[in-house]
């Protein structure tokens, strides 16, 4: 349908080499957009762009560095003459290097300040900077759609019982920083939607539910049991939502949070 057609438009996707970033790039390209796959690792984002063929290119950038982002925006405008869509997808989620210490290290009382600061830098400051540098170009042009990737954990608190083993022992805790940063992204989305509404730039959030990605069978079953649709998301389940938010199909939608979670937050 023409409402969903992104032909002639240029989209930048940050965190393009990640599990969902790859899918966002593919979905936008299939809808007709020229996609700029952006990640901190040049080789991995090059592989993503290669899969897009003539519909994409890779440009490495650091979302926490405004100089790097200015270079990215200038390069894209020199190449295509426009920026129509920005998908703020880059984020980090805690991984503990020592599984044996994960239980104690992930407790709120013990959570390392360094990990807190690093996640804030990428997950919140990165979204702020990308929007400030790249989104400002869109506002000056009087058009565009910004999609901030948040999470169900920005809406509801983690159920820590999900992270127990089959015997009921806590394996680790979902740490405080990921829900905190995703909640901040949702608040920032509303701010920016109101701020740039008159400039023709729409700003919405996409909040995915849990994505199946090699978790053990017990976790998958427990998560699925808490979801009305009875399963975790597949990485491809968010393609339609990204195209919808990027396209004219959502032309009267801004400041909203599109939950794609199989009903996880409904119960």
Spans of features found by a protein language model:
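Short, small/polar-rich loop/turn modules that mediate ligand/substrate recognition or access, typified
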Residues: 197, 202, 253-255
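Substrate-binding pocket helix/loop in short-chain dehydrogenase/reductase
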Residues: 97-108, 112-117, 160, 223
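C-terminal substrate-recognition "lid" of short-chain dehydrogenase/reductases
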Residues: 128, 143, 231-266
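Canonical Rossmann dinucleotide-binding motif of NAD(H)/NADP(H)-dependent dehydrogenases/reductases
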Residues: 3-36, 192
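Active-site helix of classical SDR
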Residues: 131, 181-184, 189
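The beta1-alpha1 cofactor-binding region of Rossmann-like NAD(H)/NADP(H)-dependent oxidoreductases
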Residues: 42-43, 60-72, 113, 237
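Conserved glycine-rich Rossmann-like NAD(P)H-binding loop of the short-chain dehydrogenase/reductase
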Residues: 33-47
